[in-house]
Amino acid sequence: LARTNIGWLATVATSGYYAPATLYSSPDGVTWTPVAAPNLTAGAGRITLAVGAPGDTVAYAYVARSCDAGCDQKDLYRSGDGGYSWTALGLNSKAPSNPNEENPTMELMGGQGFYNHMVVVDPSDPSRNTVYLGGQLNTGKTTDGGKTWRLLTNWLGQFGLPYAHADHHTAVVSTAGGRKRVMIGTDGGLFLSYDEGTSWTDQKNVGLADHLIYSMATSGSDPKSVLVGLQDNGTRIRSGNTSVFNQSYGGDGFGVGWSQSTSNVTALGSYVYGYVYYSQKDPNIQKKWTDPAFDDATCTYNGINACNAYFVTPIATPSALADPGGKTYFTNTASLVYRTDDAGASWRPIFSGSTASTYIRGASHSVAVSPVDLNHVAAVSTGGRILLTNDGGAHWVLRSTLVPGHVGFNSSIAWANNSVLYVASENPGGQSVWVVKSTDGGQSWAAASRGLPNVPIQKLLAAPNDLSGNTVYAATWLGVYRTTDGGASWSQFGAGLPTVEVSDLYMPADGSFLRASTYGRGVWDLSLR
């Protein structure tokens, strides 16, 4: 979206990023008409627009190819008439003044044009020839309208460029106070340059608790120690009573696990597509992790089929009662449920599905195990169904959780005991029942949702110190909710927690505190004693 001298410009890809985009213009933002720009939109998926200042005649469009053509970079385009006509600048065949092995040309999107996209025009340049671009791993700059380019930053250190995190999404050039600042927003936060791109700093991020947490685990032997899996910021650890979470493993961080046994400390972290790394000791530094071995013949990481895995890798940690040895964990791919009994050194499938009716959904908390034993395991399937076993995986049943008002999109299962289960939905709308409950081991289901907000639920947690199974906590997109009557009524729980998306919950066996991780506002504790 950008405003030029002809009015507002906007681009739309009608079927996500798999259909040619359309450029629209509007004089007032109310009525819109298509702009014929075939050289710009043909074969395009996502398009990002930029102007130096509202009302400019010069506009830029940074264009990715449709994802059925690879989601790579199509080109950068310039318009000199407010958006009626566009000229391609030929970035994919243009070498920067400082090329390297990764970037011999100015192709910056790296096959992720659907995701990482940034273009900003320097408003202090009256010719509008100074432009900054960002893609997957790096940024670049031109001062002559795209004729020549220079690479500015890279996520990787081997190319001798200043560091800025990967995946660029937004930028601004500010001249407020008479001092020019270039600011770029990435998956790793905010990066600033005070010298027009020569050097960069990330110090404005210091002190901000704003990582996007997918999952969280707490040490069974030291409840103050916490692991978190972060969106594109790896696995981080808090060791002891501190506010600092240090990086323990890089890349995308998804499911994490930490044994609840007080006598045998093991831990797991994960990357994409079934890549689970593991530690047989307190994982307080990166060198204590062991990476999985990949078998090319079977496409497996220590037994987990990477070719069947989702981008997100979930991990379920049993209770100390169920696993006193502290070495058993569970995960899943699209059609398999896996178990390890040696803390991640090897995995074996305990369920293997082969049809769409038995696919397991790709969610952060898609597999769960009973707090009583290791035989009762469940995984959320498609169409509002769940997969259940009560004999450790020798036999499975597929049960529907659908009741009037509940349409599925199940995200999380909470076992209160071997008979009482709760299932939550992450459906963004169109239903009135967000949680369903079974008291007969999953054979039948009933609504258990009154009082919950009409927003997705990421995780359910049954209080381990309530043997009746009536106390359950819900991590919703609007904070934490609790029921103490088995789902007959829910209410928002606890004071002080921001009303934001809660991604995971933890409670020790004695129920002394509740810990919540959020998608952008850190980790929070609430004492219950």
Positions of predicted regions on the chain:
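Beta-propeller blade termini and top-face loops
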Residues: 1-529
